[in-house]
Amino acid sequence: MEKEETSLHWHGLILPYELDGVPYLTTAPIKAGETQVYKFPLLQSGTYWYHSHTKLQEQNGMHGALIIHKRHAEPMPEQVLILSEWTDMKPFEVHRRLHSANDWSAIKKHQIRPGTVQSYSDAIKDGALGVKLTNEWKRMNAMDVSDVYYDLLFANGKPVDETRQFKAGERVRVRLINGGASSYFWITYAGGKMTVVASDGIDVEPVEVDRFIMGIAETYDIIVTIPADSTAYELLATSEDRVRSTSLWLGSGIRQLAAPLQPLKYFEGMQMMNDMMKMNGDLDDMGMNMSLQQMDMNVVMYPEITGAKENSHADHGNDRYNSNALSDIVTLNYAMLRSPTSSALPPGPLKEMRFELTGNMNRYLWAIDNKTVSETDRILIRKGENVRIILYNNSMMRHPMHLHGHFFRVVNGQGDHAPLKNVLDIMPMETDTIEFAATETGDWFFHCHILYHMMSGMGRVFSYENTAPNPQLPDARKAARIFARDDKEWHFMVQNDFATNGNDGEAMYMNKRWNLQSEWRLGYMKEHGQEVETHFGRYFGKMQWLFVNVGLDWRTREGHEGGAPRDNLFGQVNTKDSRTVAHFGFQYTLPMLLVLDLRIDTDGQLRSQLMREDIPLTPRLRLDLMGNSDLEYMGRFRYVLDKTWALSTHYDSDMGLGVGVMLTY
């Protein structure tokens, strides 16, 4: 690369930690224009891959397959398939917009799969108005199973790939790699069942399935049969949100399609989340003890399992989220994986820890125990220990957790034959246990492999005690500061309504905890007045519903009808037409996503405000409402044209009626 530094992580390989490829943690970055040579012994075989671990480069396609064959393996035709995605939007822009709670991705998906926005018009159409209202009462935004809209999915870097050399009766080993930045893939095959024989490069006892889902960064080896000549059979990879798909065609001739996955039933999923979400944002599994993907709460949205009609909440007892109990379609889960050889840990002291996976979509903060990588110390472990980690996912998103430089046992009821993996997908409300032998030295990253979650801080660093200084990073303190920068990034957002009656907008410059925001209302005539407010503060709580801030409030208005000032709602003299004060206060998100703003200023004046923005009346038509104790009020309709522009009309108690265009960045 000519203009920026990069790195190379050897995903799943056992190698010296200083070659692991995490810049500023284990390895020096590869500077622009430089060449880096990696030399290490190969200690394993299987399906692996490599990718950049620098910023968001992986989203731009900096990855590839790494296949290590056994010295003495059964001869079999094979095909490598690395799955990935492409967005026309720059990855930095994707990341910035995720932190602004912007739902342009959902609007784009709606064009392909109607219903993804889950607007009020969608709810009424589906007879789910009560479900939508309950969802917002519990302070949740619309449900989505993936964060990002992608313009294309790729099979080996192509929208569709094909291999024509396979003949009838041949058994083909397909080495599947999910090289996506944030996409899960459902895998199905037009030629019949698939036999899973390896996961994350390590053999498992063969298990026959109809389909399985691949978490980000997972690899699976499957064996499929080519049923007949003169036919090409589709190996179909469908994104979890079912908006896009890509294919690998095996064989030549007439194309035999795999059955496409039908659109998700989003309001069934919303009802499920309503049932399981507490008012404080915690999740309640209702005593189901979910683990190992056996109880998939999303099954209520799958029409191929629960039927096309809205009957997914029929009483099926403890099996109501178990797809294998509800259907003849066999879906792989981790409990079905078994190592062909013993994976028992060696004797040694046990170090046990518990991690709670936390996060919220509104401000896109993802963490472990509500702390990001930069907010925690490295976790010390000793060589010779056995480390057990109990993971509970208390967030609404699934997380593929990846451990560098080690394979862990997935404790799944198989005893000494628990499967070995380096990535484990943990679904909402699941509790899963992994354990590994601490046999290495140095520092090793443990993180969510959804790229934008990792960049937001969802991870930890395991550090072996008594590790010698890393020659790759001679200034360890400086390297640690640079490594911690990723989840400290600040993001700028602005929204401005260029209307006929004035200019109305806000700007924010914020990171994971802090926010500097400014609002303005600038009338074109002196009786409309001018107002500017600025706030700086910190968000508190796991869900970040509380924002404590200090700020400045300046406003002036001349010749306003009504003469002498009126009292405000608190019985104090209303100073809304002339005010220059500092203030202290807080904003708190109430049920129905109403934001309460309560403050006291340096003149002793109390002020309160209720506001609700971005009410989705239809997928593109939005409503904003505001009222405050100064007896001001506002209502605005916006029709979203694209990710930047919207048509608007609003009525403001001071500036009157106006129409215009709104900019969102």
Model-predicted segments: where are they?
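Short, aromatic- and glycine-rich surface loops/edge beta-strands on solvent-exposed regions
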Residues: Y48-T54, T231-E240, W444-I450
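Outer-membrane beta-barrel translocator domains and adjoining extracellular loop/strand segments
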Residues: G21-P23, I368, D416, Q530-T534, ...
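Histidine-centered copper-binding motifs that mark active-site loops
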Residues: M1-I216, I222, R255-N289, Q293-M295, ...
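N-terminal edge beta-strand
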Residues: Y149-A168, L357-K383
